[in-house]
From Swiss-Prot:
The keyword Ribosomal protein is annotated on this UniProt entry: yes
Domain of life where this protein originates: Bacteria
PANTHER family: 50S RIBOSOMAL PROTEIN L33, CHLOROPLASTIC (PTHR43168), LARGE RIBOSOMAL SUBUNIT PROTEIN BL33C (PTHR43168:SF2)
Gene3D superfamilies: Ribosomal protein L33
TM annotation in the entry: none
Protein name: Large ribosomal subunit protein bL33
GO biological process assignments: translation
Keywords from the UniProt entry: Ribonucleoprotein, Ribosomal protein
Amino acid sequence: MAKGKENRIVITLECTEAKKEGKTVSRYTTTKNKKNTTDRLVLKKYNPSMQKHTLHKEIK
C-alpha cells in the first residue's frame, strides 16, 4: 500500500527585495517535504513588478 501524503505541505514564498523597497510583493506557492527540509526555503524566483529574479523566502 502507498504511504499517505502527510509529509508534504503547501508553503508560500514571498519576495524579500520588493518588501525592502516598498514595492508590490510577489508570492509563489509550492510544496515541500517537511521531513527532508525542516528549515525555511529560500529560492530565487522571478518578480514581475521588479522585472528581475529576486530572493523569495518561505513565510507562514
